[in-house]
């Protein structure tokens, strides 16, 4: 592993995020259409060569404008450089997500790419486990739950999509880890949080923007509750 400091998502510019999303799509298209595994571009700025953690999410865009998940895989540890992590997570999401069949060429015009850049997970330490929800900000934090061999994570965007509160977010991450929903109350269970910034295509191969997940949560979930 590199001795360089891992990239924190707050260091990225919007142009950095745009580059990563375009790179994720290019990696998948080159592999699918030409059987080529792309290499990281040369002469990249230093930030892309430092260790980084990314998740690539691929969604299918339907005629009614709604999207459904098509693949999502990534890295929670700074094993690769930021650029390598983006390429590898994109390929894994497209071809090796066990929940879905491998992506097909005819789908390329109807899929949307989203790259989430993560900070290193940090354990949340509290004296009273009931204080854990107060340590989480929906739209900013993703969660990791770990106990022995059991481990699961949910990205910051997930509670927005379902309008979960903090306790539900904790419980659903417990379930993702293969544990009981109230596992977060167990002192032997380790709870970690990390920050994430998500960059996304508006349309397939279209404009790329950064999601304001805190605003999305406030606006979308308030509307749903009403």
Swiss-Prot record:
PANTHER family per the UniProt record, alphabetical: AMME SYNDROME CANDIDATE GENE 1 PROTEIN (PTHR13016:SF0), AMMECR1 HOMOLOG (PTHR13016)
Protein name as catalogued: Protein Smar_1309
Domain AMMECR1: 15-210
Gene3D superfamilies: Hypothetical protein ph0010, domain 1, Hypothetical protein ph0010, domain 2
NCBIfam families, sorted: AmmeMemoSam_A, TIGR00296 family protein
Organism listed in the record: Staphylothermus marinus (strain ATCC 43588 / DSM 3639 / JCM 9404 / F1)
């Amino acid at each position: 592993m590199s001795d360089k400091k891992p990239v924190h998502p707050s260091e990225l510019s919007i142009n950095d995020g745009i580059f990563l999303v375009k790179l994720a799509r290019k990696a998948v298209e080159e592999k699918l259409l030409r059987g080529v595994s792309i290499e990281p571009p040369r002469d990249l700025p230093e930030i892309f060569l430092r260790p980084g953690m990314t998740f690539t999410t691929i969604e299918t865009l339907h005629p009614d404008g709604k999207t459904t998940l098509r693949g999502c895989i990534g890295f929670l540890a700074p094993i690769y450089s930021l650029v390598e992590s983006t390429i590898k997570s994109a390929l894994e999401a497209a071809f090796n997500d066990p929940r879905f069949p491998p992506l097909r060429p005819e789908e390329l015009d109807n899929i949307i790419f989203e790259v989430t850049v993560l900070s290193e997970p940090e354990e949340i330490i509290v004296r009273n486990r009931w204080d854990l929800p107060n340590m989480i900000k929906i739209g900013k934090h993703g969660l990791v739950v770990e106990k022995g061999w059991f481990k699961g994570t949910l990205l910051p965007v997930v509670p927005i999509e379902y309008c979960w509160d903090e306790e539900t977010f904790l419980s659903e991450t417990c379930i993702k880890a293969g544990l009981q929903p109230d596992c977060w109350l167990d002192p032997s269970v380790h709870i970690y949080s990390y920050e994430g910034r998500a960059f996304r295509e508006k349309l397939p191969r279209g404009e790329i923007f950064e999601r304001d997940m805190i605003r999305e949560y406030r606006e979308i979930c308030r509307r749903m509750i009403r």
